[in-house]
Amino acid sequence: MAGTVTVPGSSTPSTPLLKDELDIVIPTIRNLDFLEMWRAFFQPYHLIIVQDGDPTKTIKVPEGFDYELYNRNDINRILGPKASCISFKDSACRCFGYMVSKKKYIYTIDDDCFVAKDPSGKDINALEQHIKNLLSPSTPFFFNTLYDPYREGADFVRGYPFSLREGAHTAVSHGLWLNIPDYDAPTQLVKPKERNERYVDAVMTIPKGTLFPMCGMNLAFDRDLIGPAMYFGLMGDGQPIGRYDDMWAGWCVKVICDHLSLGVKTGLPYIWHSKASNPFVNLKKEYKGIFWQEDIIPFFQNVTIPKDCDTVQKCYIYLSGQVKEKLGTIDPYFVKLGDAMVTWIEAWDELNPSTPAAANGKAK
């Protein structure tokens, strides 16, 4: 049974700790010294570390953490021929951790992300805030101008339909970052010294029908609700594109959440993004994507999932066919990606045979 977190000075428990219901997934190519900073918040949880790059390299993990570590040899051994759907030499490999997890919730973070401080100077427990976000409803069908109406001190404003005040199940909690912003390469080149210093104390639901650029470095989700759609695509080694892995997953996830009446939140919590990646290397990875996204985004804005697609898997398989048909004319890469999306679902179902992700809502 999960424990609880009690607010100092309060006799009432606030957020369930979900100690036995949540895995932390970390993709890495280096020693995980950054975990020392997170020890107070992460040590109670199980970690799934996905080692990218050279599988003969030893990744050092600080003592005292409960973890399992998978390298490329492990991925090939577990998935066999289906391992082709897991990216190599790209942080997109993290989605393998989502697949092998057996927990209800996932939190994923990059190894260059440190504990941030709120305006009062207090360390931010990012994981606790993500749990709060996931365990409270979302409001995707009607925008509340006070943002999160379920937060203490807030409510639904005048004119908000009473029939919608129960909200929807929350599938995704998308956190933000202080210091180094998550910019594309052209923006990095124009603003090399820009830092995000604005702390906005808010969580909001992204409205139904609105897409967003999902970032995977501070992200939590309900694996039971949306896990099979959290595929980070084919990126990195041998592929014509990179740095679109989390955004691709986010577009797929948002379209499916809209169809299944699930919610996606963004805002708190913040982490401290410690270092900027090389904008020239990034430009090479992103170059094709910068042009392709002008077709990709309208594709997701206009795709309509049939009503008989009532599970995440069915929705995702339908999307894969549409990707091949509608985006395959742009570049053969999208035909390959559509096939990989099917392979991903097949691999997911093989490793998770008794828990297919079904909608708690109903298809719209």
Swiss-Prot record:
Q: Which reaction does it catalyse?
A: UDP-beta-L-arabinofuranose = UDP-beta-L-arabinopyranose
Q: GO MF terms on file?
A: UDP-arabinopyranose mutase activity
Instruction: Give the multimer and partner information.
Output: Homopentamer or homohexamer.
Q: Where in the cell is it found?
A: Secreted, Cell wall; Cell junction, Plasmodesma; Golgi apparatus
Tell me, in one coarse class, where this protein mainly resides: secreted
- Tell me the function of this protein: Probable UDP-L-arabinose mutase involved in the biosynthesis of cell wall non-cellulosic polysaccharides. Was initially shown to possess an autoglycosylating activity which is dependent on the presence of UDP-glucose and manganese.
Q: How is it modified after translation?
A: Reversibly glycosylated by UDP-glucose, UDP-xylose and UDP-galactose.
What GO CC annotations are associated with the protein?
cytosol; extracellular region; Golgi apparatus; plasmodesma
Record-linked PANTHER family: UDP-ARABINOPYRANOSE MUTASE 1, UDP-ARABINOSE MUTASE
Q: Where is this motif: DXD motif?
A: 110-112
How does the record comment on the protein's domains? The conserved DXD motif is involved in enzyme activity.
Listed cofactors: Mn(2+); Mg(2+)
Glycosylated residues are R158
Q: Which UniProt keywords apply?
A: Cell junction, Cell wall, Cell wall biogenesis/degradation, Cellulose biosynthesis, Glycoprotein, Golgi apparatus, Isomerase, Secreted
**Mind telling me which residues the site (Required for activity) is annotated on?**
R158, R165
Is Glycoprotein a UniProt keyword of this protein?
yes
Q: What class of enzyme is it?
A: isomerase
Keyword set includes Secreted: yes
Q: Which GO terms describe its biological process?
A: cell wall organization; cellulose biosynthetic process; plant-type cell wall organization or biogenesis; UDP-L-arabinose metabolic process
Tell me the InterPro entries matching this sequence: Nucleotide-diphossugar_trans, RGP, RGP_fam
Output this protein's name. Answer: Probable UDP-arabinopyranose mutase 1
